Amino acid sequence: MAGIAAKLAKDREAAEGLGSHDRAIKYLNQDYEALRNECLEAGTLFQDPSFPAIPSALGFKELGPYSSKTRGIEWKRPTEICADPQFIIGGATRTDICQGALGDCWLLAAIASLTLNEEILARVVPLNQSFQENYAGIFHFQFWQYGEWVEVVVDDRLPTKDGELLFVHSAEGSEFWSALLEKAYAKINGCYEALSGGATTEGFEDFTGGIAEWYELKKPPPNLFKIIQKALQKGSLLGCSIDITSAADSEAITFQKLVKGHAYSVTGAEEVESNGSLQKLIRIRNPWGEVEWTGRWNDNCPSWNTIDPEERERLTRRHEDGEFWMSFSDFLRHYSRLEICNLTPDTLTSDTYKKWKLTKMDGNWRRGSTAGGCRNYPNTFWMNPQYLIKLEEEDEDEEDGESGCTFLVGLIQKHRRRQRKMGEDMHTIGFGIYEVPEELSGQTNIHLSKNFFLTNRARERSDTFINLREVLNRFKLPPGEYILVPSTFEPNKDGDFCIRVFSEKKADYQAVDDEIEANLEEFDISEDDIDDGFRRLFAQLAGEDAEISAFELQTILRRVLAKRQDIKSDGFSIETCKIMVDMLDSDGSGKLGLKEFYILWTKIQKYQKIYREIDVDRSGTMNSYEMRKALEEAGFKMPCQLHQVIVARFADDQLIIDFDNFVRCLVRLETLFKIFKQLDPENTGTIELDLISWLCFSVL
């Protein structure tokens, strides 16, 4: 219940703008300005109680408290490490980022790319921080986390060994913005060791809020040049690199003056007419040095004399140091990898860019209810969350004669790095996209069933199921309606996720789920309608007061169930019996009369029939995945969120729902629906309750 309330509160705050870059969420409710002012007034330096300078902040295994790698480590402030520490000197450069004893080169490569764009860097690293003016030992940074911007506060105590920084550091040793940024990122992920191993695209996304895709240039898609052109038009960040095969290869220079292991940026893509044929050219920037390409289409290459002079002047006019052109074919031959970080519309302040249309949807997989696994598990796959994608407008320009709607889908699993210290790691995740059949077009209130997925193949799917934070793919499909199904590879894996869809044109996206519905059987009978046989049975069971209490009901039902071989049960708990009596006790006596007991008896017989029919494996019990079908048979339709709550409340640790809990669930639901209907006679879908009424209904 607390989790549901927290989600509702968070959704309301997000609707009011909390989590945007201008209104970043304060991580762990720590307010940078308030904490700094407190320290300045008290004349003390900040010590972060939420990420203290202790061994557990370093790691849990390789960097754990008893690891040899962490012996002799001292936490020191920059003022204790060098005589004149600086936060940032003359802007951020690559030399500010040198790797230490942590396997987070993926993160450092993303930080290096961040330094190429001052506007985006300033969003992540507020530059008005220093070790001189208003210094209080506290610094702050902003990261994108699963759809919202978060402000993270850290103190400036950094791990050192033999007087040197243990992790990231600047080349000259007196600049500390990168070390403090790494510490803030370690804090939000649980510890430094949680940063070991990852993809540069992950860092790209957390620094920009964009959606990052990458391409192996040895196997490029046929339309890659067009993808690059469109990405540049949209203001995306593009980086490329040449793989290294050994540590000795790092910074090695090829015979045509390209540097291996270097982060280059792609800044242009043009087609020019040369000697009667079209040539595709790529402009590359080497931000770190004077080394420039000496192959075809370099600055002094005769090939420039083969194109129109005005075109040559436009393309060769220098804008940035270290920029050079090369043919697209040489680009594919010499470089290994291209990364594109597609930025969100709010990141781009200029109106010159063609901006993506962005939609984000949050969801979760819950063991026993909505964690159905992949298509290899047909009995449960359909239980996964489902999302409708409605593509309406085709792209403005066709690629290679192919029309359609271009969109990117990124599925991110949340908070998995933070859970590494608890022994958890990344799930293996992926997704499928299914075409909606004509008969279901326009409907968003139907969760597609098991039979649909048994008879329909995926129109598209993620390239692979993989244990990375994000699975991302680019698609092009005709206008129409499609269902996106995200899943873990195996069923029963708990996890939270967010899905982001970047589309060329405006498209409609929303969760597909069953609407809440209760078709309850009404009993319009009088005592005169009850046959004599049942009257005699009731008189025998009820005793002298001619009424049945919850305790008497428990005894009666235990005897009945003991005779059933097809339902495993130890009888009903007194709690279930009290709920049944409350549901039908119309006169408030706390007991059931003849008519009330007759209605209950009829309901229990119906419940037994449903339970038996749903139990297809004849185990005498029901598993949590069968519960959804059972609820439908009983007249209830529920969205995924309610199924998660029901399984969490009524299933045991083996995901079994026994007959007692099955009946308790149905009776509880029926009672709640009847209360709501009584308080909402106009069927508005909302009711108002004061605190005492809310509490009375909640403790039913």
From Swiss-Prot:
Alphabetical list of PANTHER family matching this protein: CALPAIN, CALPAIN-2 CATALYTIC SUBUNIT
GO MF annotations in UniProt: calcium ion binding; calcium-dependent cysteine-type endopeptidase activity; cysteine-type peptidase activity; cytoskeletal protein binding; enzyme binding; protein-containing complex binding
Start and end residues of each stretch annotated as Linker: 515-529
EC number: 3.4.22.53
Binding residues annotated for Ca(2+) 1, in chain numbering: 658, 661
Pro-peptide positions on chain: 2-19
Gene3D superfamilies: 2.60.120.380, Cysteine proteinases (3.90.70.10), EF-hand (1.10.238.10)
Pfam families: Calpain_III, EF-hand_8, Peptidase_C2
Binding site for Ca(2+) 4: 292, 299, 323
Binding site for Ca(2+) 5: 542, 545, 547, 552
Sites where the protein binds Ca(2+) 2: 229-230
GO terms for cellular component: calpain complex; chromatin; cortical actin cytoskeleton; cytoplasm; cytosol; dendrite; endoplasmic reticulum; external side of plasma membrane
Residue ranges, annotated region (Domain IV): 530-700
Protein name as annotated: Calpain-2 catalytic subunit
Organism lineage: Eukaryota, Metazoa, Chordata, Craniata, Vertebrata
Manner of cofactor binding, per the entry note: Binds 7 Ca(2+) ions.
Calpain catalytic domain sequence ranges: 45-344
Main location: cytoplasm
Keyword field contains Zinc: no
